[in-house]
Amino acid sequence: MSASSHHDLHSKLSLGGILVTLGIIYGDIGTSPLYVMKSIIGLHTIKPEVVLGGISAIFWTLTLQTTLKYVLITLSADNHGEGGIFALYALVKRTKVKWLIIPAIIGGSALLADGIITPPVSVASAVEGVRTYYPDINTVPIVIAILVVLFTIQQFGTKLVGKFFAPMMMIWFAMLAILGILQITQNTSVLCAVNPYYAYKLLSIHPDGFYVLGFVFLCTTGAEALYSDMGHCGRKNIRISWIFVKIALLLNYFGQGAYLIKHAGHTLKSINANNGNPFYLVMPEWFQPFGIVISTMAAVIASQALISGSFTLINEAMRLNFWPKVKIKYPTDLKGQIYIPSINWLLLAGCIGIVLHFEESSKMEAAYGLAIVLCMIMTTILLTYFMILKRISWFIIAPLILLYLVIEFSFLIANLDKFPHGGYVTLIIASALTFIMSIWYTAKKISKNYTKIVKIQTYKKVLAELSVDLSIPKYATHLVYMTNANRVDEIEEKVMYSILQKRPKRADLYWFIHINITNEPYKKEYKVTEIIKNDLFRIDFNLGFREPTKINLMFKEVIKDMVAKGEVDITSRYESLSKNNIIGDFKFVLSEKFLSNDSFMHWHEKLVMNTYFFFKKMSLSEEQAFGLDSSSVKVEKFPMVLHAPEKIELCRIK
């Protein structure tokens, strides 16, 4: 599927598309009623003005932050139909503003950290509903068991279970709306919470003061997922389905508020000592067992969306040189559905660690929100440059960006209050991920700066002579090198050293393959240049940042196409094999760098490069990353010299 057809497919508005959107996009933001009002009220006595203030703050947060910023503005910043912070960075990279790499890396790391905390919070909040019937039950083993099953089935793909996501989430949102309406009809005064005055007043009357915004923010943590998963569903489908989702969410929040106002003067524990969660309290007693099951399934779906999103994020990070190469599997034929084993088990370990550390959802909520608000701020910064790129007037850009920086920094300051209570956990995770991405990107940049590029023109004559020099044993019929040289008439000096000096490698045909990762997510193009007639070819692959680099398969397709067009003869040049039309052998030569002992580095370069090579040992080898058959690959080691030593003065004695 081409990039344009992929974009056209997802830009279409359809009932099926809307249903799929419900199943994929809204799991995170859709399950927030499980814990938001519970967090705002906490252990304090229920006061009508606090309840109205909380509902009002939720209403305006969902309106300004989720609806206006993400659904209306940010979704317009699509990269050929794809969304997410890395897709946005790939889009604004063309502004040539180098420091934009910083918000991209911080935002991506924060989003990954959120993928570790969200599944435990959602699943734990849902499972704790069983305490209504079994007050002394330890929910930790149940939560861990659900998470283990969820992460284990990832390797088989989610095509089958994904069919149930849409109808299940439809039931979930319908349940939210109906439960809310039942309570609102009994206390319509709660509707006055649409007045923003109550939200403003909340900051002065809530026991936690300004920091209550940290709990209010939990209602919009899933907004970033709307943007990240745009490529799966399309902008129009998200915008239309959001109308239904927002109404269902608000009805439930207002319904919880109506119930709480009726119980003013009490605490949540005094209303129900076993399960003081207003989400479950609004349910009729006979419906609660069904509500617990539906909530748990919705929480699992929310977790699934974040796991899939994390795989996509890491895949993009690898293409943009932010992350070490790791093994990627394609469990189904669905486009864009990938499985990364190492990330899957790391996420599971992180989720289990969170559950064991905090044990209860109320304690996990303290760790929740800090990372994602950082991601939102980074998105706002990148969005500013997208608007500049689109030549939008500064009279529009300035007030919009200022508004969202004020809102998001307010949420950030409020969330910082959670730091000693658990917020440090996600911040440590996000910092570790930022460190890895920064090291990998910087090391790649240093490596590129110290790679010597030479003109192929200088070597044309000797290459042509080498291929027919019978005094040198033939190394391969076809000799293939990967190159990072962007220009067709250039090549790395180490490649020519490998062919001519290390051990002269005679071949009938030489091939240079260059991969260019494009800003378009699903581009698959190639260009063939004949540098020396019947001796040297260069193939340039232009691949989207979401496309897998299956070089072995793609190279075969290119060769097949060239043979069909009579552009190249790949039969063996050995007489006995040639007359029987036997295809010649192909040999790939890959270079593996190591840090030379002759390198003189500054301390920061030493830290970066040593850490880079440490991570590289644990990452995928070049042959695996390119999808090459190891039997046809030769790996050569080349020393990487940074700041070559000055000439050493030696005195010869007799």
Swiss-Prot record:
UniProt GO MF annotations: potassium ion transmembrane transporter activity; symporter activity
The keyword ATP-binding appears for this protein: no
Gene Ontology annotations for the cellular component aspect, listed alphabetically: plasma membrane
Parts of the chain that traverse the membrane: 17-37, 40-60, 71-91, 99-119, 137-157, 164-184, 202-222, 240-260, 281-301, 338-358, 369-389, 394-414, 423-443
Record key words, sorted: Cell inner membrane, Cell membrane, Ion transport, Membrane, Potassium, Potassium transport, Symport, Transmembrane, Transmembrane helix, Transport
Localization terms from the record: Cell inner membrane
Membrane topology, from the record: Multi-pass membrane protein
Predominant location: membrane
Catalyses which reaction(s): K(+)(in) + H(+)(in) = K(+)(out) + H(+)(out)
Family the UniProt entry places it in: Belongs to the HAK/KUP transporter (TC 2.A.72) family.
Role according to the record: Transport of potassium into the cell. Likely operates as a K(+):H(+) symporter.
Name recorded for this polypeptide: Probable potassium transport system protein Kup
Organism whose genome encodes this protein: Flavobacterium psychrophilum (strain ATCC 49511 / DSM 21280 / CIP 103535 / JIP02/86)
Name of encoding gene: kup
